[in-house]
């Protein structure tokens, strides 16, 4: 991708000028942002980066664009308030690309989200070839060119008739193509009348036809007595033309065939005149129906909607395009596949009521030679299917027959309860999870159906489309379509998503993956002159892939777009054309523009906190000593999920353990889909064996906490104070004041969630929603309480000259000072300061928090626990949204949890956190099918010395160049996919 020269001097080029920005904590700042350049906004958490980038510039750019639309169009778009700013000039229409995955649509996939699937549907509709589901022959209709070529290839001079069958009455209705494949229906006997024959002949004369043909004889209309010899109870043909084979008759032949198709309901017949009177005439039949010429099955001609699982025309009728159905779940029916049939592998038949069925099953198995004393998973596919499907001739209905019988009995309550234990989402048996009807799956390009193409990863799809071998005509038709598909695949590859399959549900993607898909889609749209506002695009990216992301950003810039990137990644900051550093602190102590200029200028600026870290003046040091494994481990044997197959791993407890690896290497699969789910299933009595073969050491874990980035609440009522239970203490403080006692107020009167003291006009929301019918709903400040949420009588109660509403508007830092005499309140709030959230307001809506803020708020809640002993905490990229300075606080919080007896397991790419871990498990070596294995384990120093580890290569640079060496630890590389013994590791 070509690199344009950096455009970094605002005075030399067009720019966005902002004067007097006061959104949230911004301190009336003025700044400029150069057009057609990459501008990075940096600063500690809460310094005002998102307020500047999203709530000011994006909001105004989007608002102005929406205001330019008609009132009708505006009703379908989100209403955006004008930001609190004096003036913004030079702004372009804005596009926000956030790290949040808000997709919950079970039909949305990577292919549909990137528009690749739209082009695939078009490609298969235009050049796809349909193959018969019955006999495998290609399904086609006879075109005029193909017929002419086939006929003219015969020896010259042969004479023949061009005919079509005379239909004296309508045929039965043709088979419904949507139910294909169906054999052609037999013609019903026709009962003729003289009037019907006369009307048909008159109609033929009017249309210019003068001859009929039957059994080798030609009958002229000019001699009506000849027609008396025609037997109209047998097939009669209209003679369209008489020809002799030669190259000169090509055009005339095609015209005649076209007439037959039009008049003969899509069918044409060529009958060759025999050389001898006793010879049987040779006949060739052609038709324009889209059917299999071998077995007669009729199909629907491919068109884009046939390949859409969102359209009833193309969706599988059984699952309606979802790919799964609610059916009996085999994993619940046979939860422990290590059991044999004799030991009760089929769980429902171990119940007293149905034990007789187990006896019949074992009897059937013996007659079929199926071993009953072998583990179910060791049976062959044929043997398993025999047990499941049964054999009615042998008197055994099978497991499926058993559940079908129960379905007929589910009018009984106890049967419905019994069935519910074994129900679940199962792959649709009709489409095998492909979502499309059989006719769509019968269409192929280069031997692959559209569902087979979508099952490919981006990495597999690129060479497939690059190497497509097409005919000259197909290549001309598909040229532009293939160009769009290849371009989108290339961009997905360049943003580090080559391991994703095209049919991967977008609801299962991480926030970082979702953002990079949006980034790739934006680049493929080749939009110019737009303002792109990005929220930490490096999240979820391994350091190896960061350079590819930077090239994507430069590509967007080189198209003529302006990029405003909120970012903490040092490589991305150093690649920027222009840098703005906000601070100096968070919340009320932030919101000031500390520095604005080029990256080189920032490295020399003494006031920029980011610059001080980048030039090495400040750094996150390697801990002086690492904790050693104390002999307690969670051991997983035979882990299997997604790209992990048969993996053995030991995770030491009581340490900070980092799971690392390139994108798609299996980190989340190992930690969440295997470890977390298996531990939860073991604790709740579920089937943990569906995640691994053996699980040991979990008795050392008292609880498992997944601290993710999901919101703390779905309504504006949730806030930091209520989440940490600090608001309970604050309400008690207000209820204990003399004024509250005088009025008879209890702590409940100071709650906005229950009736009593809250404003009933807005029910404690502070806002009311007005339905505008034909316009978007408008949310207005409540006129009764003016947004305070409380009745005036409650607001009259003061503590230290502040009412409850004013307290909720305080930041955590302000509240700590305000409630200093109340240790119960400060004890709960102080943990927010420890995790770097002192800038949050107590009453700030939980829906406004970023994913990283929500995760750290949950971490703070866990830090308030009295007893963390034996708890395993799992974090997925906890550094999301964190500045270098905030990472120090996060690591301190982790150490506090571990000092309290907990274990901390993190999935992380940030090298500063990785080098601070006590133990590492590095996955890889690549993503997708080339991942799912353990590349290296041990201390960061050990992994850094492993030549097979991509993480190790970058970690070695971080340990040596930025942090004063590797502490002299020597180690040997550990073999992949082995269970290491942490006790033998050298740790200083």
Regions found by a protein language model. Give the residues of each.
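Conserved phosphate-binding elements of NTP-dependent enzyme cores
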Residues: 1-988
């Amino acid at each position: 991708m070509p690199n344009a020269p950096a455009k970094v001097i605002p005075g030399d080029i067009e720019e966005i000028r902002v004067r007097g920005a006061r959104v949230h904590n911004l301190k009336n700042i003025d700044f400029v942002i150069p057009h057609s350049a990459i501008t990075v906004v940096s600063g500690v958490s809460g310094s005002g980066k998102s307020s500047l980038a999203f709530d000011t510039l994006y909001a105004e750019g989007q608002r102005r664009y929406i205001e330019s639309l008609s009132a009708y169009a505006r009703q379908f778009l989100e209403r955006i308030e004008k930001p609190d700013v004096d003036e913004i000039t030079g702004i372009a229409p804005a596009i926000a690309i956030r790290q949040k995955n808000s997709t919950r649509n079970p039909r949305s996939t990577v292919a549909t989200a990137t528009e690749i699937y739209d082009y695939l549907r078009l490609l298969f509709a235009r050049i796809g070839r349909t193959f018969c589901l019955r006999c495998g022959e290609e399904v086609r209709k006879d075109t005029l060119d193909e017929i002419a070529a086939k006929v003219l290839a015969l020896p010259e001079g042969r004479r023949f008739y061009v005919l079509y069958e005379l239909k004296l009455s309508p045929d039965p209705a043709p088979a419904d193509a949507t139910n294909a494949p169906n054999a052609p229906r037999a013609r019903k006997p026709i009962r003729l009348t003289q009037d019907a024959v006369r009307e048909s002949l008159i109609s033929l004369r009017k249309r210019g036809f003068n001859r009929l043909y039957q059994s080798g004889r030609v009958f002229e209309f000019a001699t009506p007595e000849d027609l008396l010899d025609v037997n109209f109870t047998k097939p009669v043909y209209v003679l369209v033309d008489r020809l002799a084979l030669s190259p000169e008759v090509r055009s005339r032949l095609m015209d005649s065939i076209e007439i037959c198709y039009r008049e003969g309901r899509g069918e044409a017949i060529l009958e060759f005149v025999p050389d001898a009177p006793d010879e049987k005439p040779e006949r060739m039949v052609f038709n324009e129906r889209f059917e299999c010429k071998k077995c007669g099955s009729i199909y629907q001609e491919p068109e884009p909607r046939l390949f859409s699982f969102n359209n009833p025309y193309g969706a599988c009728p059984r699952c309606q395009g979802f790919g799964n159905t609610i059916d009996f779940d085999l994993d619940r029916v046979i939860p422990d596949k290590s059991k044999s049939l004799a030991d009760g592998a089929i769980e429902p038949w171990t119940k007293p009521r149905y034990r007789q069925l187990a006896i019949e099953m074992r009897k059937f198995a013996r007659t079929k030679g199926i071993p009953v004393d072998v583990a179910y998973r060791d049976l062959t596919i044929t043997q398993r299917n025999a047990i499941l499907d049964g054999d009615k001739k042998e008197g055994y209905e099978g497991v499926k027959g058993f559940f079908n019988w129960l379905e007929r009995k589910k009018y009984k309550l106890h049967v419905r309860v019994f069935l519910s234990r074994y129900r679940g989402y199962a792959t649709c048996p009709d489409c095998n999870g492909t979502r499309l009807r059989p006719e769509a799956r019968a269409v192929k390009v280069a031997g692959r159906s559209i569902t087979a193409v979508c099952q490919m990863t981006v990495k597999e799809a690129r060479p497939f489309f690059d190497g497509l071998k097409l005919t000259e005509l197909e290549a001309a038709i598909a040229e532009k379509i293939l160009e769009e598909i290849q371009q989108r695949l290339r961009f997905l590859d360049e943003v580090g998503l080559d391991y994703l399959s095209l049919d991967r549900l977008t609801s299962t993607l991480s926030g970082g993956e979702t953002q990079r898909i949006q980034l790739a889609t934006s680049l493929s749209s080749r939009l110019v002159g737009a303002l792109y506002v990005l929220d930490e695009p490096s999240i979820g990216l391994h350091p190896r892939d960061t350079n590819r992301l930077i090239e994507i950003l430069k590509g967007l810039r080189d198209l003529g777009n302006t990029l405003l990137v909120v970012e903490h990644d040092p490589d991305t900051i150093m690649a920027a054309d222009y840098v703005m550093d906000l601070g100096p602190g968070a919340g009320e102590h932030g919101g000031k523009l500390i520095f604005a200029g080029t990256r080189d200028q920032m490295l020399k600026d003494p006031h920029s906190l980011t610059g001080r870290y980048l030039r090495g003046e400040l750094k996150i040091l390697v801990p002086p000593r690492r904790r050693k494994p104390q002999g307690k481990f969670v051991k997983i044997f035979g882990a299997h999920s997604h790209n992990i197959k048969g993996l053995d791993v030991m995770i030491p407890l009581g340490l900070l353990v980092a799971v690392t690896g390139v994108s798609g290497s299996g980190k989340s699969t190992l930690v969440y889909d295997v470890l977390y789910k298996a531990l939860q299933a073991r604790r709740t009595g579920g089937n943990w064996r569906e995640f691994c073969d053996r699980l040991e050491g979990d008795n050392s874990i008292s609880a498992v906490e997944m601290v993710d980035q999901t919101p703390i609440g779905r309504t504006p009522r949730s806030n930091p104070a209520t989440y940490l239970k600090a608001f309970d203490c604050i309400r008690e403080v207000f209820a204990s004041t003399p004024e509250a006692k005088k009025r008879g107020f209890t702590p409940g009167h100071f709650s906005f969630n229950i009736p009593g003291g809250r404003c009933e006009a807005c029910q404690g929301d502070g806002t009311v929603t007005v339905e505008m019918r034909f316009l978007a709903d408008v949310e207005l400040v409540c006129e009764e309480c003016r947004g305070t949420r409380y009745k005036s009588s409650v607001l009259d109660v003061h503590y230290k000259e502040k009412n409850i509403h004013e307290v909720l508007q305080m930041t955590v830092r302000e509240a700590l000072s305000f409630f200093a005499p109340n240790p119960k309140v400060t004890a709960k709030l102080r943990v927010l300061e420890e995790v770097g959230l002192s800038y949050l307001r107590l009453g700030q809506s939980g829906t406004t928090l970023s994913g990283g803020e929500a995760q750290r708020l949950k971490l703070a809640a866990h830090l308030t626990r009295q007893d963390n002993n034996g708890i395993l905490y799992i974090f997925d990229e906890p550094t999301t949204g964190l500045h270098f300075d905030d990472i120090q606080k996060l690591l301190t919080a982790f150490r506090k949890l571990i000092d309290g007896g907990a274990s901390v397991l993190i999935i992380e790419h940030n090298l500063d956190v990785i080098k601070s871990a006590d133990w590492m498990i590095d996955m890889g070596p690549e993503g997708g099918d080339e991942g799912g294995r353990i590349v290296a384990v041990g201390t960061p120093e050990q992994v850094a010395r492993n030549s097979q580890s991509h993480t190790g290569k970058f970690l070695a640079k971080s340990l040596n160049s930025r942090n004063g060496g590797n502490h002299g630890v020597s180690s040997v590389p550990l073999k992949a996919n082995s269970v290491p013994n942490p006790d033998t590791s050298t740790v200083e």
